[in-house]
């Protein structure tokens, strides 16, 4: 009886992919081969692929069996529940034990013999898949048991909610009108700020209020920034400047020391007490237009007390004498020229 499902090969025969050839067809292939029929003729006659016929005949000649699969069957299972239990016990006693040490201990304790002892790779796979998760879960449970209960911390900003438990002081915040009440288990530590002031943004007022409510000791509260004005400070005396005594300011200005390398404010000398600059050297009336190098003095930005805008250093240039000499020389040259003509 042919199967009702399968595929058709090149010869027109039906086969099921992944399934072994039925035993009846296997036996018929062997019988035809013993009659002296060639494998190619057996393949055409039974509509079985040539490779399948050759493989079945080769296995029959080697082992004498027509059954599919391994001859001796699969290896018996060695990782029995008893072996896994002993491996778990060894691992719990010594978490740093190696797989080869577990194998030797199984043999030493008589749990397994040399024929059914699991291999090192099998023990490693058991430790990784079956015992590894249980060991991690046990460590996590023990860690949770020994872990102390976290103390509720102060929220940095009452705008955001934190996973820490809500303290009793934070739960005392009244609910704004028109907003439905929120249960204490899901309520936020603080309500939304009423303004965009520095105090509300940073949460200074809420933190200090919470500390003062939960602490038995008295702690000063931080006042609102808007309440800090100039009216809260004491009025300054009429003889004071910006709240400081004039006498103290005068003493500091009089005896104050200037930084190194800079003169003090009171050490400057007035311009009237300074001596005038020395008079420059006289220029001969018969010299051409020139001036001594010492006469070129770099002027300052301020004017001398006895000087003018043209002579800020109170040193007059003898320009009249020089110009008179030049004029006499010009007149003499003109007279000589006229007499020569």
Swiss-Prot record:
**Predominant cellular place of this UniProt entry's protein:** nucleus
| Coiled-coil positions | none
GO cellular component terms, alphabetically, are: chromatin; nucleolus; nucleoplasm
* Keywords from the named record: Developmental protein, Disease variant, DNA-binding, Nucleus, Paired box, Transcription, Transcription regulation
Cell compartment(s), UniProt:
Nucleus
Q: Which Gene3D superfamilies match?
A: Winged helix-like DNA-binding domain superfamily/Winged helix DNA-binding domain
Residue ranges of the DNA-binding region? 4-130
Q: Which PANTHER family match?
A: PAIRED BOX PROTEIN PAX-6-RELATED-RELATED, PAIRED BOX PROTEIN PAX-9
How is the subunit organization of this protein annotated in UniProt? Answer: Interacts with KDM5B.
Q: Which disease is it linked to?
A: Tooth agenesis, selective, 3: A form of selective tooth agenesis, a common anomaly characterized by the congenital absence of one or more teeth. Selective tooth agenesis without associated systemic disorders has sometimes been divided into 2 types: oligodontia, defined as agenesis of 6 or more permanent teeth, and hypodontia, defined as agenesis of less than 6 teeth. The number in both cases does not include absence of third molars (wisdom teeth).
Provide the function of this protein. Transcription factor required for normal development of thymus, parathyroid glands, ultimobranchial bodies, teeth, skeletal elements of skull and larynx as well as distal limbs.
Please give the name of this protein: Paired box protein Pax-9
Q: Which source organism?
A: Homo sapiens (Human)
The record lists the lineage as: Eukaryota, Metazoa, Chordata, Craniata, Vertebrata
